């Protein structure tokens, strides 16, 4: 089936079956014969329609003879009318009597008087015609646009074939050799004849030989590029000369319509203007040729024809775009298909649909989770056809017309019928932007008065909806299959868990949380305190009777016979829960986190139905008690801490001290800045803590005895914040504590904090300082929303064809998971990371070596619990990264479907879910940056390591010297300190910073909380390893260092500055008394090079002891961290861009030594134990992070900055790169408190690593440097080995997501993504086949997607259902047995 057939499919059953059986679509270059074959006649005139009769002109652009009749079954002159003459061709006007819709599919053509080059093959870089003829673009354009001649046959002259010569050169050659001595050509004709002469078979052999013979890499690259195009032509049966056209197609007139407007004017498609231009110029050229006009005039006309055709195909690609009457560039054929408004994205991937409507949403607190309120008026419009058919069926209306009238009159019976039609008919609700799949869910409609859609409050978080004027769209699924999918898959009750991380997304929030928190708080001396009850029901009765108060602490015997200490409110909540949830889950104050845990437990243990019922009950009770509590905000709730004044004064004194030190020259400006910011951060934190302390507890007095007791506060703001209903400590601090430090738009923190709170009011200066942060937030929001949406689009495109395709791929490879530690503390335990994954190898008990779990076990909550109990510290799991499936991923490598809680089904679109999970929070976070209001959210710098466990110290690769105070100073950065327990298991591990003081020794037994090492967080010291005398070298004032005198202090510091000349190398050596440089560890001279910004702490010639500090370098000034920095970082990683601050990476393991400098760059040498040393050049001003004599592993960073991903891949391999990418991206999201499962990132990284670069093609058909799909590479190599040829070798390759999307095997998917013309040009040249395996391609050709319920193996499966006997309805019995599980659903 050709593309042509696809787009001319009529609605007959045979054709629809045809489209279903469509196997693939191929795109090739159209030959002139093809174009003539498509055509129904030649368009000879530029006329469109007759201005008097409005009928199309004959042989014009709208000619009825060529394209078909304007009116159904009526010829142009009116001789034949109606169906009876069908198929007759009118002898008078030549029009076939047929349906007018053929004007949508019949094409015409224009025979060109001179050949014309196709602009796509000429201008798409690299130019296809240019590469094939081995000509530069400039030369080719000169020839095509009649600027220069090209030699076709040099004859007896000294010119070479295909040499480009100007008019003057040509005249000189003719003068010299005579006119017949050579043949030259100009324009597309010449290019066409050169293309015709090419013998591609010979050219292929010749290029292959040249490529093997040459040593030059650039030449090899050039030859390979040319060879690729030659091979493409040979394999696709395209002919090179077809890139130059002698006939062009004219698209059907209905696709470029001419529409009459009121007032006798016409609106026309731009294409008509472009076609008219071509026809006019073509006709003029024909006439000039017939008249035998001078050569120069004909040449000019040919050039104009070439330009007109260029504009038709791609206006504006070359030269200035042709504009219409209003100065707007005309829309060419290329513009029709590319971009957001093009055919692909506007009409094929996104369509407007019937049976839909939109309205404002309001909250529906009385709804059940599976319901939504649908306005009656809206329902009437949406369900009209159903109502018509029902009216007819009941005999209330005889025809559809009368039914229509009844509905328009809104008769009473219509509303009754509407009720019935709508009952249990699922409808879909969608809120834009639909960032993840929970943005469309289905509900059962309840008809409501008014015009607003009512939405259940618990689904708001999934939609990210609020009721400040948001609108939502309603869609009605029509077919039975669609309704079943809505009910079974999309119903809100089936979407309780988030696909991004598997935690519940249907979780009570705001008022409900506040109500539940209020219910479960306890309070001293309440009515009925210390009463004992025999069962929970008795508590409820006592409460209803007013015997006990809601917050009273009481004793209750539970069903298992145990007596528990609890409160009345908690028992009331317990009554709502499914019985399998333990009482301990509610015997606590219910905050938002606890409620989420409760819902999650209920889902895992009691199932979906019980959870849905629980959520609805929690919602009702929460609202009721929030109303009863009457929690509200008043100004006096904002209590300003009494100690605030003192804290601020203390901080101010510290800052004054720091300023004084700065004035005395003891510290530099950067240090001062860092310290001041730190003091204020700490002060703000202290004020905040004081405020929370004061606001968080109340003193309650017993009215009878007068006894007093501190209780959890009932302050409204505190309750809202603590419960997680609204607001956080940060906002409370700004309201009642102090606003704290603010950030400038550049991200720097302003040193002066705002010491007032909103309650006290801000001064003018403070208000002005605040505006910085606020405005930055607003600007960021606007910019980043677009950025984030674009990131999501790229992510979706790269993984859109990743589907779960089989159960087990049989891989023996996987990845190792361990705890994620930060500074020695476990940040994310192994059990959390392994949850929902499948074990690759069996897991054994670390102590007894007993088998705990066999391979291929899914790690669920129970398995994870055992891993924690047995203290398993590492497991090997299966991962998407190591899955061997040829297409998609297998079930076992993916693991659990996070949104459903069971192992993933075959056919699940895990790729798109991964893209949505990563993209969605990006948008959310960018929209939320300004919530912190730019208040500097900066953590206080860490300056020591503290033991988290008792144990024994083990030091590795630690070099330390003892200073004059007897303390050990750590040298270098490769030293590590670990703590092991009695069993020899490593409990924590720290990398010791350079210059830190080590406070423990090897093998020392330590206790928990002991300080292990400490350091100056603001400065990095350079510590001497040996005693001796200081000798400066290249430390020259004004050249390499500057004495910076502080105006205020009159003190000077010597700071190393950027030095212009290359031969300076400031360093400090330590010499003996004879002036010889001493040696330190590893036999390296004791010379310390000083980076830019280092501050010298010693004088030339001074005596020095080991462990003394020679110089210090202030650490970087801190900027506020914000996802705004994070989003570009995520995009940078996914796009594999070169980081701005690129680090130098060591490719081998070995010892680092400094080796002087060359060409203005510093040289580092890494010497391995065996093998050759490797040199690295580090640019000036880049800070080297390793010290002389350090040991580095392959892939370790030698300088500060981020490593380039290609370097990581080369030095450490795919697995490490995948882990690095996952960790770096998670870092950004985790910082913002967003949980995304690792597997989503892995799915995307898998797509980035799906290709390899061929190093040696061996006996295969690959080319050197070609990028090949891993699957394809494996298949080809297996085939080659089977036939006794040498297999190819390749190295892994990492592609950015845009690149990976554009190099996908489906050209339809790639074309609809970006660079449409380029993708289509390449694909047509290669005669590419698209096998329609992804989702996008199938949507574009109008089929069901091959995933989910449309997964091909499901669609082609017949299911036999055995007959079942009808069973009597047991509903009432069930109800009696267990009233909790049977509900009014």
From Swiss-Prot:
Residues that coordinate or bind Zn(2+) 1: 75, 77, 90, 93
What positions does the entry give for Mg(2+) binding?
Answer: 466, 468, 470
Cofactor comment text: Binds 1 Mg(2+) ion per subunit.
**One GO CC annotation:** DNA-directed RNA polymerase complex
What residues form the membrane-spanning segments? none
| EC number(s) reported in the record | 2.7.7.6
Q: Mention one GO molecular function.
A: DNA-directed RNA polymerase activity
> Which InterPro entries does UniProt cross-reference here?
DNA-dir_RpoC_beta_prime, DNA-dir_RpoC_beta_prime_bact, RNA_pol_asu, RNA_pol_N, RNA_pol_Rpb1_1, RNA_pol_Rpb1_3, RNA_pol_Rpb1_3_sf, RNA_pol_Rpb1_4
Q: Name one Pfam family in it.
A: RNA_pol_Rpb1_1
Which cofactor does the UniProt annotation name?
Mg(2+); Zn(2+)
- Kindly state which reaction or reactions the protein catalyses: RNA(n) + a ribonucleoside 5'-triphosphate = RNA(n+1) + diphosphate
Which SUPFAM superfamilies does the record match to this protein? beta and beta-prime subunits of DNA dependent RNA-polymerase
Extract the Gene3D superfamilies matched here: 1.10.132.30, 1.10.150.390, 1.10.1790.20, 1.10.40.90, 2.40.40.20, 2.40.50.100, RNA polymerase II, clamp domain, RNA polymerase Rpb1, domain 3
Which N-terminal stretch is annotated as signal sequence?
A: none
Instruction: Tell me the domain of life.
Output: Bacteria
A Gene Ontology annotation in the biological process aspect, one of them, is: DNA-templated transcription
Residues the entry annotates as binding Zn(2+) 2:
809, 883, 890, 893
Keyword line: DNA-directed RNA polymerase, Magnesium, Metal-binding, Nucleotidyltransferase, Transcription, Transferase, Zinc
Q: List the disulfide bonds.
A: none
Report the protein's function.
DNA-dependent RNA polymerase catalyzes the transcription of DNA into RNA using the four ribonucleoside triphosphates as substrates.
- Stated family: Belongs to the RNA polymerase beta' chain family.
Subunit structure comment from the entry? The RNAP catalytic core consists of 2 alpha, 1 beta, 1 beta' and 1 omega subunit. When a sigma factor is associated with the core the holoenzyme is formed, which can initiate transcription.
Which HAMAP family has this protein been placed in?
RNApol_bact_RpoC
The protein in question is named DNA-directed RNA polymerase subunit beta'
What species is given as this protein's source?
Nitratidesulfovibrio vulgaris (strain ATCC 29579 / DSM 644 / CCUG 34227 / NCIMB 8303 / VKM B-1760 / Hildenborough) (Desulfovibrio vulgaris)
């Amino acid at each position: 089936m050709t593309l042509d057939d696809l787009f001319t499919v009529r609605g007959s059953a045979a054709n629809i079956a045809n489209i279903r059986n469509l196997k693939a679509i191929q795109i090739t270059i159209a030959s002139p014969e093809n174009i003539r074959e498509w055509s129904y006649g030649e368009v000879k005139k530029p006329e469109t329609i007759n201005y008097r009769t409005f009928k199309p002109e004959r042989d014009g652009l709208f000619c009825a003879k060529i394209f078909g009749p304007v009116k159904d079954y009526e010829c142009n002159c009116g001789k034949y009318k109606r169906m009876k003459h069908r198929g007759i061709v009118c002898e008078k006007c030549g029009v076939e009597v047929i349906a007018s819709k053929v004007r949508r599919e019949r094409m015409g053509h224009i025979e060109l008087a001179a050949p014309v080059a196709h602009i796509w093959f000429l201008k798409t870089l690299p130019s296809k015609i240019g590469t094939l003829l081995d000509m530069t673009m400039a030369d080719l354009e000169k020839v095509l646009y009649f600027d220069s001649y090209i030699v076709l046959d040099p004859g007896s002259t000294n010119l070479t074939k295909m040499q480009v010569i100007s008019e003057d050169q040509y005249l000189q050659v003719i003068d010299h050799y005579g006119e017949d001595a050579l043949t030259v050509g100009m324009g597309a004709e010449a290019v066409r004849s050169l293309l015709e002469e090419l013998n591609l078979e010979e050219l292929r052999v010749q290029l292959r030989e040249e490529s093997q013979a040459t040593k030059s890499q650039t030449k090899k690259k050039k030859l390979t590029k040319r060879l690729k195009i030659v091979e493409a032509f040979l394999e696709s049966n395209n002919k090179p000369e077809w890139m130059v056209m002698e006939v062009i197609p004219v698209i059907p007139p209905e696709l470029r319509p001419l529409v009459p407007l009121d007032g006798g004017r016409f609106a026309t498609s731009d294409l008509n203007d472009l076609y008219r231009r071509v026809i006019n110029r073509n006709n003029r050229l024909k006439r000039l040729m017939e008249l035998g006009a001078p050569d120069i005039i004909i040449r000019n006309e040919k050039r104009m024809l070439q330009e007109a055709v260029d504009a038709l195909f791609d206006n504006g690609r070359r030269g200035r775009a042709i504009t219409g009457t209003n100065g707007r560039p005309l829309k060419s054929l290329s513009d029709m298909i590319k971009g957001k408004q093009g055919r692909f994205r506007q009409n094929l991937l996104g369509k407007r649909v019937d049976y839909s409507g939109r309205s404002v949403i309001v909250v529906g607190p009385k709804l059940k989770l599976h319901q939504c309120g649908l306005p009656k008026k809206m329902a009437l419009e949406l369900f009209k056809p159903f109502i018509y058919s029902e009216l007819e069926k009941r005999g209330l209306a005889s025809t559809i017309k009368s039914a229509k009238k009844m509905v328009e009159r809104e008769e009473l019976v219509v509303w009754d019928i509407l009720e019935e039609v709508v009952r249990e008919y699922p409808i879909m609700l969608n809120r834009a932007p639909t960032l993840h799949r929970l943005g469309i869910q289905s509900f059962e409609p309840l008809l409501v008065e008014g015009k607003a859609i009512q939405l259940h409050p618990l689904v708001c978080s999934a939609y990210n909806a609020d009721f400040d004027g948001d609108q939502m769209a309603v869609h009605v699924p029509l077919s039975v299959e669609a309704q079943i999918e809505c009910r079974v898959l999309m119903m809100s009750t089936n979407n309780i868990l988030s696909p991004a991380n598997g935690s519940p997304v249907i979780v009570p929030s705001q008022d409900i949380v506040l109500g539940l928190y209020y219910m479960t708080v306890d309070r001293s001396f309440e009515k009925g305190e210390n009463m004992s009850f025999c069962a929970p029901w008795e508590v409820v009765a006592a409460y209803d009777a007013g015997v006990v108060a809601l917050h009273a602490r009481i004793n209750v015997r539970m069903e298992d016979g145990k007596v528990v200490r609890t409160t009345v409110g908690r028992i009331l909540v317990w009554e709502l829960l499914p019985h399998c949830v333990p009482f301990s889950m509610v015997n606590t104050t219910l905050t938002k986190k606890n409620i989420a845990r409760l819902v999650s437990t209920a889902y895992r243990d009691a199932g979906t139905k019980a959870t849905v019922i629980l959520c609805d009950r929690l919602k009702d009770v929460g609202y009721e008690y929030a109303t009863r509590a009457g929690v509200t905000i008043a100004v006096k709730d904002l209590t300003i801490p009494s100690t605030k004044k003192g804290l601020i004064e203390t901080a101010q004194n510290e800052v004054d001290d720091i300023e004084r030190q700065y004035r005395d020259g003891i510290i530099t400006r950067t240090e001062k800045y860092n310290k001041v910011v730190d003091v204020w951060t700490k002060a703000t934190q202290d004020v905040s803590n004081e405020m929370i302390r004061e606001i968080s507890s109340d003193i309650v007095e017993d009215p009878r005895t007068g006894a007093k007791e501190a209780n959890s506060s009932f302050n409204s703001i505190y309750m809202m914040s603590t419960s997680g209903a609204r607001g956080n400590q940060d906002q409370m601090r700004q309201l009642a504590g102090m606003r704290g430090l603010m950030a400038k738009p550049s991200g720097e923190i302003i040193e002066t904090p705002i010491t007032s709170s909103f309650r006290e009011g801000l001064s003018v200066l403070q208000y002005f300082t605040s505006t910085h942060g606020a405005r930055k937030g607003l600007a960021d929001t606007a910019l980043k929303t677009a950025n984030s949406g674009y990131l999501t689009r790229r992510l979706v495109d790269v993984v859109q064809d990743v589907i779960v395709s089989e159960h087990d791929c049989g891989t023996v490879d996987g990845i190792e998971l361990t705890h994620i530690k930060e500074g020695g503390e476990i940040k994310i335990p192994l059990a959390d990371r392994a949850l929902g994954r499948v074990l690759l190898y069996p897991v054994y008990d670390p102590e007894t070596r007993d088998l705990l779990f066999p391979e291929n076990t899914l790690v669920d909550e129970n398995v994870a619990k055992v891993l924690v109990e047995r203290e398993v510290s590492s497991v090997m799991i299966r991962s998407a990264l190591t899955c061997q499936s040829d297409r998609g991923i297998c079930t076992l490598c993916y693991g659990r479907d996070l949104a459903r809680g069971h192992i993933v089904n075959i056919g699940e679109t895990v790729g798109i879910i991964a893209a949505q999970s990563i993209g969605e929070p990006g948008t959310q976070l960018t929209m939320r940056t300004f919530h912190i209001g730019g208040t500097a959210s900066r953590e206080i710098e860490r300056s020591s390591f503290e033991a988290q466990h008792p144990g024994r110290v083990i030091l590795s690769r630690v070099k330390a010297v003892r200073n004059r105070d007897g303390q050990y100073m750590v040298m270098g950065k490769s030293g590590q300190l670990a703590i092991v327990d009695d069993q020899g298991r490593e409990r924590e591990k720290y990398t010791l910073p350079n210059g830190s003081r080590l406070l423990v020794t090897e093998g020392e037994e330590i206790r928990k909380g002991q300080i292990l090492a400490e350091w100056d967080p603001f400065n990095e010291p350079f510590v001497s390893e040996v005693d001796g005398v200081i000798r400066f070298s290249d430390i020259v004032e004004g050249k390499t260092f500057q004495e910076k005198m502080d105006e205020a202090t009159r003190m000077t510091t010597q700071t190393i500055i950027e030095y212009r000349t290359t031969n300076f190398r400031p360093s400090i050596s330590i010499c003996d008394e004879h002036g010889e440089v001493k040696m330190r560890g590893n036999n390296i001279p004791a010379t310390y090079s000083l980076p830019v910004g280092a501050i010298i702490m010693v004088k030339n010639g001074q005596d020095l002891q080991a462990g003394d500090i020679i110089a210090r370098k202030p650490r970087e000034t801190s900027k506020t961290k914000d996802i705004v920095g994070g989003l570009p970082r995520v995009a940078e990683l996914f796009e594999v861009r070169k980081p701005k601050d690129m680090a130098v990476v060591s490719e081998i393991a070995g010892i680092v030594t400094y080796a002087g400098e060359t060409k203005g760059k510093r040289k580092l040498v890494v010497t391995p134990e065996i093998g050759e040393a490797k040199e690295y050049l580090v640019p000036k001003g880049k800070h080297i992070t390793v010290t002389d004599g350090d040991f580095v592993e392959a892939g370790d960073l030698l300088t500060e900055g981020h490593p380039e991903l290609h370097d990581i891949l080369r030095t450490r391999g795919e697995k490490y790169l995948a882990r690095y990418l996952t960790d770096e991206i998670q870092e950004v999201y985790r910082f913002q408190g967003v949980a995304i499962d690792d597997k989503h990132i892995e799915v995307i990284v898998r797509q980035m690593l799906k290709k390899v670069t061929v190093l040696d093609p061996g006996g295969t058909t690959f080319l050197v440097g070609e990028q090949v799909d891993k699957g394809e590479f494996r298949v080809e190599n297996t085939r080659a080995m089977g036939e006794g040829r040498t297999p190819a070798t390749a190295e892994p390759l990492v592609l950015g997501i845009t690149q990976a999307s554009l190099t996908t095997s489906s050209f339809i998917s790639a074309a609809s993504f970006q660079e449409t013309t380029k993708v289509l040009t390449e694909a047509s040249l290669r005669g590419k086949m698209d096998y329609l395996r992804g989702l996008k391609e199938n949507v574009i050709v109008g089929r069901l997607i091959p995933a989910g319920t449309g997964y091909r193996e499901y669609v082609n499966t017949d299911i036999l259902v055995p007959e079942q006997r009808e069973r009597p309805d047991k509903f009432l019995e069930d109800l009696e047995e267990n009233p909790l599980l049977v509900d009014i659903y």
